[in-house]
Design a protein with these regions (language model features):
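Structured alpha-helical segments in the cores of large, soluble enzyme domains
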Residues: 56, 83-100
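Short beta-strand
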Residues: 61-64, 97-104, 139-143
Length: 234
């Protein structure tokens, strides 16, 4: 199976639309200027091949017309971000996330599931993970629990990694914080996929003890002595 086909399966989402991005110069704030737009029509293997070849960047919309997802992501849009430190925390908390460097140096933390799951459920778990990681204000994809497909809503896309293939700045990080090749990324995704029951069993690197009626991430925050700040989030 080609790399493009594997990425298409990994980032399977909306069949109604996808995203394209043309990257320009990097501004003084460290953020790359870009022209991004939603394009009606299915994301194809051919378009992803162009992405891998560095010709045209593409993005996938996680939520489909039935409000289901097979992947989601946290978008931590901080350009002085210590990627290795954050990646280390992901593994410390035993979160089923794969970190990829974004086009401007931030982090996309991807969650991949074995089957289609309700978008609302994916967003719920990603919200817990964002709080546990200390980034409760970050963007979450999908951005909606539900879309009105009959009115033409399609959702929001997130740029895919490995623009330019292995010669890229949008690479995934392994457990040691080193960049992965595209082939290594494919293998990592296959190992990282989870079911809804797997998500329900997450312990965030510890054992459940208190807050038994609430999100487990509150236990993590409490153990760090910072529960008051977050008590009204959920």
């Amino acid at each position: 199976m080609s790399d493009a086909k594997k990425l298409l399966e990994t980032f399977e989402g909306s069949s109604a639309a996808h995203g394209t991005t043309v990257v320009g110069r990097v501004g003084r704030n460290g953020k790359a200027e870009s022209d991004s737009r939603v394009v009606r029509g299915v994301l194809t293997e051919e378009k992803i091949q162009e992405h891998i070849e560095g010709k045209m960047g593409v993005g996938s919309i996680p939520i489909n017309q039935d409000n289901m997802c097979k992947f989601g992501a946290l978008d931590i849009d901080t350009y002085d971000l210590d990627l290795k430190a954050l990646n280390s925390k992901v593994h410390q908390l035993k979160l089923p996330l794969i970190m990829c460097r974004s086009k401007s140096g931030g982090a996309h933390l991807y969650l991949f599931t074995k089957d289609w799951e309700p978008a609302a459920l994916i967003r719920e778990y990603l919200t817990e993970m964002s709080v546990a990681l200390g980034y409760s204000g970050c963007e979450i994809f999908p951005k909606q629990d539900k879309i009105l497909a009959d009115r033409g809503d399609v959702g929001n896309f997130i740029n895919m990694p490995y623009f330019g293939g292995d010669i890229t700045t949008r690479y995934a990080l392994d457990t040691k914080g080193e960049s992965m090749t595209l082939a290594q990324f494919h293998k990592a995704v296959s190992k990282a996929k989870v079911s809804a029951s797997d998500l329900d069993s997450l312990t965030f690197g510890g054992e459940r003890s208190h807050f038994t009626d609430g999100p487990y991430c509150l236990e993590v925050i409490s153990s760090q002595g910072a529960v008051t700040e977050y008590r009204n989030i959920f």
